[in-house]
């Protein structure tokens, strides 16, 4: 049976996938309008929050909007309902629609905007283009009755623990005898108050990135049968995986720059692309960064990319790329619309695992401001 859910629960789940810690300094992320302390039945995922998007949300009885681009990005000196920004906020509050933004944290996240773009372009052997965050690793050791081992193991893995490279749910267990004596006031799951108890237990060990520590601990406690869970958390010295903006990967087949530009147009489903470089030059290694990636052209060059795919390319930055000998294909900022389907799939899967009774769907409003002739 599906469980009712509130906004806090939805966002806590979402932030296991796209932690706030991944956002670059100063980014405007998180809850921007309304409250999460309310029941949620309908969630709409959008790239942008425009008044037309809010009108769609009202029509579809949306309780929560998850957006990539924050509607409140620049500081507001006042909120006037005579102005577009004020009207948008007023409509959200009037119709009890909460708006949550995941911006650069969603760019950085595994399976986020840049991974979705790299996947659409069929890149293999991908790595981070511009590191922005190192997520320190920690190790958890928890003591579990043997018959509850699999329950706790699954809960930890589903909360984000045990990810090593391309593997998830990695853990190690060893068996032993645990001992404890419940004191007055205790309500032991096993044993009697005042009597020493010896229990066949398993020491279950796994690693997790610091960014999901809260979720991992909550999952452990919720899935564990004991009222007082015995566990240890300590840092480990392995070098954690770098997180960051953009991706660099390799095409399956080498092609000319012109062929690649048309490939980008098709795969990202955009109305047109701009191209910088020799149309007949061959490309194989690709750097991609969703949105405005102007300041990362040198990162793309240092990574050995033959071509850099990014949006909002400036005139003089295009000249810089030419002088660097770096080809560029610009599909526009709206190529990030790919996040709508990607986030909807991911969050739907996570909510289904929790048996949350919530509908998650993609906004159908086209927020691209440009018309191509």
UniProtKB/Swiss-Prot annotation:
Origin: domain of life: Bacteria
Alphabetized UniProt keyword annotations: Metal-binding
Pfam family, one: DUF34_NIF3
Disulfide-bonded cysteines: none
Family classification: Belongs to the GTP cyclohydrolase I type 2/NIF3 family.
Record note on quaternary structure: Homohexamer.
Name of the featured protein: GTP cyclohydrolase 1 type 2 homolog
Gene: yqfO
